[in-house]
C-alpha cells in the first residue's frame, strides 16, 4: 500500500481571496449622534443589548418610518439591563456578586443572539466594559492596583467571538472629555470604553450631529473597497451603504 504523504502545513488554514461580507465596527459619538439609528439599518434580525436605556424615542420612530415604507416592522429586538450603580449601591453587601450575575446573564444572552441574529449591537460597549470591571474588581477605582489581564481577556474573547461567524457586530461607544492636565480640558473628546476596541474591530466609525443632520466619519476600515471610504465623512450613512462600499461584489439585497 503506498504511503500517504501528509503536508505538515495542513495543520494551518489556507487563506482565501474571498472576504466575509459583514461589518464588525465601533460606533463612537456623543448623545444623539445617530449611533443606534445607524445600526438599526443593519441586516435583520437585529438584537440590541442595551445598558443605557436609550432606545425610547429612537427605535419607535425608526419602526414607524420602516413600516410606512415596507408595510411591516423590522425585526429589531432589545434586552435592557438595569445597570446604573450609585455610590449607595456600591456600599451594599453582595454588590459585586450582583455585578457578576448580571455580567454572566449578559454573556449568555450575547452568545444566544450571535447564534440566531444577523446583527448584534452592544449599546453601549462603554457600559459593558464598566460592568465587566465591576464584576471583576468591585467598586470603581478598585482596579487601580489590580491585574487587568482577566477582565481584558474576557472582553477580547467576546468581542472576537462574532469573527468566527458571519454576523454583523456593532460596539457603540460614548465619548469623554480629553484632559491635558489634572484641572484643564483640551476641548477635544476621546472614546470611552475598553481601550483595545479600535484594534479589535474591522471598522472604526465616528458619529456626529450638526444642524439637525447626521454625519459619519469612517476611520480604519477593512475590505476590498476600504480605500474608497477611509478618512471620509458621509451624511445619513447606513450599514448597507458601508457594506456595499467595503464589499463591492455585494448589493443591497445582501444587507437587508
Where are these regions (language model features)?
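C-terminal regions of RecA-like/P-loop NTPase motor modules
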Residues: 1-10, 19-23, 212-256
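Conserved P-loop
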Residues: 7-9, 19-115
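Glycine-rich, phosphate-binding/catalytic loops in enzymes
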Residues: 44, 65, 136-141, 187
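Residue-level signature of catalytic and energy-coupling elements of molecular machines
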Residues: 48, 123, 201
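A short beta-strand-to-loop transition that corresponds to the Sensor-1 phosphate-sensing loop
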Residues: 52, 123-124, 171-176
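Short acidic, S/G/P-rich loop/turn micro-motifs used as interaction or catalytic elements
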Residues: 54-55, 127-129, 177-178
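Phosphate-binding/switch loop-helix module in NTP-utilizing enzymes
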Residues: 88-165
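Phosphate-binding/switch region of NTP-binding enzymes
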Residues: 161-241
Amino acid at each position: 500500500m503506498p504511503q500517504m504523504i501528509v503536508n505538515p502545513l495542513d495543520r494551518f488554514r489556507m487563506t482565501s481571496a474571498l472576504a466575509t461580507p459583514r461589518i464588525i465596527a465601533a460606533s463612537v459619538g456623543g448623545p444623539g449622534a445617530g449611533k443606534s439609528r445607524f445600526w438599526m439599518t443593519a441586516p435583520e434580525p437585529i438584537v440590541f443589548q442595551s445598558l443605557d436605556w436609550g432606545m425610547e424615542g429612537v427605535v419607535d420612530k425608526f419602526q414607524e418610518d420602516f413600516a410606512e415604507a415596507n408595510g411591516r416592522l423590522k425585526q429589531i429586538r432589545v434586552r435592557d439591563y438595569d445597570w446604573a450603580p450609585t455610590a449607595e449601591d456600591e456600599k451594599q453587601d453582595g454588590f459585586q456578586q450582583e455585578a457578576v450575575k448580571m455580567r454572566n446573564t449578559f454573556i449568555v444572552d450575547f452568545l444566544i443572539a450571535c447564534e440566531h441574529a444577523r446583527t448584534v449591537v452592544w449599546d453601549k460597549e462603554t457600559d459593558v466594559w464598566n460592568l465587566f470591571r465591576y464584576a471583576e474588581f468591585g467598586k470603581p477605582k478598585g482596579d487601580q492596583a489590580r491585574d487587568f489581564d482577566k477582565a481584558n481577556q474576557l472582553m477580547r474573547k467576546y468581542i472576537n467571538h462574532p469573527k468566527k461567524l458571519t454576523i454583523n457586530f456593532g460596539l457603540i461607544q460614548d465619548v469623554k472629555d480629553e484632559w491635558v492636565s489634572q484641572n484643564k480640558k483640551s476641548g477635544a473628546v476621546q472614546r470611552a470604553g475598553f481601550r483595545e476596541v479600535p484594534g479589535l474591530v474591522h471598522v472604526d466609525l465616528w458619529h456626529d450631529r450638526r444642524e439637525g443632520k447626521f454625519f459619519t466619519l469612517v476611520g480604519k476600515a477593512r475590505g476590498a473597497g476600504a480605500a474608497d471610504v477611509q478618512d471620509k465623512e458621509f451624511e445619513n450613512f447606513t450599514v448597507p451603504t458601508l457594506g456595499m462600499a467595503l464589499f463591492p461584489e455585494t448589493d443591497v439585497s445582501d444587507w437587508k
